[in-house]
A protein has these predicted regions:
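A conserved active-site-flanking secondary-structure segment within enzyme catalytic domains
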Residues: 115-125
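Short, thiol/selenol-centered motifs that function as redox-active sites or metal-ligating centers
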Residues: 102-103
Length: 125
C-alpha cells in the first residue's frame, strides 16, 4: 500500500496539514502524521492542538512513498532546523520518491538545494 507521512511542528498551518491528511486518506493512501517536536501533541499556528500519530524518532520510514511538509510559522522554521528530517528528505529525493510542501514549506527544500533546476512556487509567491 502507498504511504504518505505529513510532518507536524509547533506553529504549522492547520488547514495545510490536516486537509492533506484528510484528502490522502479518502484516496485510500495510508497517511500518518509525524511530530518532529519530541512530543505527540502539536500546537498549530492558530492554537489548535493536534495529536500526531507518531514521533519522528519512533517512526519507520522504510516504506514511505511521499513526505509532506505543511507551511505556517514558526512551523516551517522548525522543519528547516530538524537535522533528522533534513537527512530523510535528502535520501527521499535521491531515491526519486515524492516530496510535497505547501505555502512557506518549499523553502525547506530550497534551502537544501533540491529545487535547483526545478520550477517551484512558495509563499510569498
Amino acid at each position: 500500500m502507498k504511504k504518505a507521512y505529513v510532518f507536524l511542528a509547533d506553529g504549522f498551518e492547520e488547514i495545510e496539514g490536516l486537509t492533506v491528511v484528510d484528502l490522502l486518506r479518502r484516496a485510500g493512501i495510508e497517511t500518518r502524521t509525524v511530530s518532529i517536536m519530541g512530543q505527540e501533541e502539536i500546537q498549530g499556528a492558530h492554537g489548535i492542538i493536534v495529536k500526531a500519530d507518531s514521533l519522528f524518532e519512533n517512526t519507520d520510514f522504510s516504506e514511505v512513498k511521499m513526505l509532506v511538509l505543511p507551511g505556517g510559522m514558526p512551523g516551517t522554521i522548525h522543519l528547516k532546523e530538524h537535522k533528522g528530517l533534513e537527512e530523510l528528505i535528502l535520501k527521499h529525493n535521491e531515491e526519486k520518491k515524492y516530496l510535497a510542501a505547501i505555502c512557506a514549506a518549499p523553502t525547506v527544500f530550497g534551502g537544501m538545494g533540491i529545487l535547483k533546476g526545478k520550477k517551484a512556487i512558495c509563499y510569498p509567491g
